[in-house]
């Protein structure tokens, strides 16, 4: 899991810390996840990956929130509740190709823009998330 990035100079911080840590990071991640699934739910460009999800996105929203909180360096909410994420195994039932990966990234980048993420932070976060999304490909 990634949770550290290079800041200007040699200072290192987690994405969670850069999002505001305990004071604001959790809320920012929650808002990001809500925006992400809102994009997926309403944007026709994301229709194919939306179809991979249940009609009710409540569980998906909560699980992604818990996962991203820990993945960014915050509390390990997902692991505490469900154990190791085993992302690839959990996604094997779905046909995930380059198009699905790109749709997922499209939703995430739109959500980051909607939430007003700093450009530099957004770029670094998107680069790391792309690696995770690409790892999910099984076709």
Where are these regions (language model features)?
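Core of compact, soluble alpha-helical bundle domains
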Residues: 1-139
């Amino acid at each position: 899991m990634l949770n550290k990035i290079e800041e200007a100079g040699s200072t290192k911080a987690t994405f969670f810390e850069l999002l505001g840590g305990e004071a604001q990071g959790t809320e920012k991640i929650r808002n990001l996840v809500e925006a992400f699934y809102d994009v997926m739910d309403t944007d026709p460009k994301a229709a194919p990956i939306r179809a991979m999800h249940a009609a009710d996105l409540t569980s998906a929203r909560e699980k992604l929130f818990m996962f991203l909180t820990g993945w960014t360096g915050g509390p390990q909410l997902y692991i505490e509740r469900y154990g190791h994420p085993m992302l690839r195994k959990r996604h094997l039932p779905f046909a995930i190709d380059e198009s699905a990966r790109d749709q997922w990234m499209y939703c995430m980048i739109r959500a980051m823009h909607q939430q007003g993420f700093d450009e530099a932070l957004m770029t670094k976060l998107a680069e790391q998330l792309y690696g995770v999304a690409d790892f999910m490909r099984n076709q």
